[in-house]
Amino acid sequence: MSGIMVVIEQREGRIARISWEAVAAGQSLASQFGLPVNAILVGSDLEFLAAEVAARGLAKVIRVEHPLLAYYTADGFKLALEQLIQTEQPAYVVFPHTYQVRDYAPALAARLGQVLIGDVVAIGEGPLFTRQLLQGRLNGNYRHAGNGPCFVSVQAGAFRAETTQTGASEVTGFTPTIDAAQIRTKPSEPFRGRSQTVDLGSAQLIVSIGRGIKDAENIPIVQELAKALGAELAASRPICDNGWLPMDRQVGSSGQTVSPKLYLAIGISGAIQHLVGMKGSQCIVAINKDPDAPIFEVADYGIVGDLFEVVPALIAALESQKG
């Protein structure tokens, strides 16, 4: 067995950021063993997407195509990937940890006599796979034992999409054998929820507010800071639940997952539900008057103080720098 296979999730011709994060995880894993990394696209008419993926410095990109894979079904994806894995014999199979992957990947691993190590947040030497337990209060380390490929899914924000390598990749095709009778579910048209007007996942600078803001009428103070920084404004769940900011501004387990260059957390205590959505940020700065607030445990820099004093001082400092 050799090589690392990264399954790229695409929907309606678009590749989600978490798929690039999975590629970064696969390339990080490959650096330990000098193994080639192959990206896998599943669907139909994948030529355009394959060209996009092929620019990421991979050994090859494999287009797994069949008319019955045009729309996602758990049966179709399991059958197609099982045949590909049996043909390619990879040592590791890496997935982005998405709802779709959770639907089919555990069963795929079981069909091949394996288990899925899900929601991995770090990969250490060995390799050692780390995932969070008890709502993030503990870390558990896992190793793969036995023969057969190791199946892993990586948590959103745990690996940086921008660290993927660059360079041309070979593109090949694979046609699985699938019969319509093997597909036990009938795909419907993709669900289209309310359009999300704010893509916090692509923001490089984020200013986020929590309960410490006290009242909706105080939000303009932080909005002014965000404007001075050229940052997107975000919030923890209580702010959005109260209707003080739209739901598409929410960061956390029930909101968006972000990994900006700077995440400025203002008046946020640091509940685990919020931390899982922003802990992948490159630099976290926290402002909170409670010195024991959990947010300081993940912050790179912390200011213990009243936000209503600190934020105006920051705005004044930024304005003075602009001259």
Residue spans for each PLM region:
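N-terminal glycine-rich FAD/FM-binding segment characteristic of electron-transfer flavoproteins
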Residues: 1-323
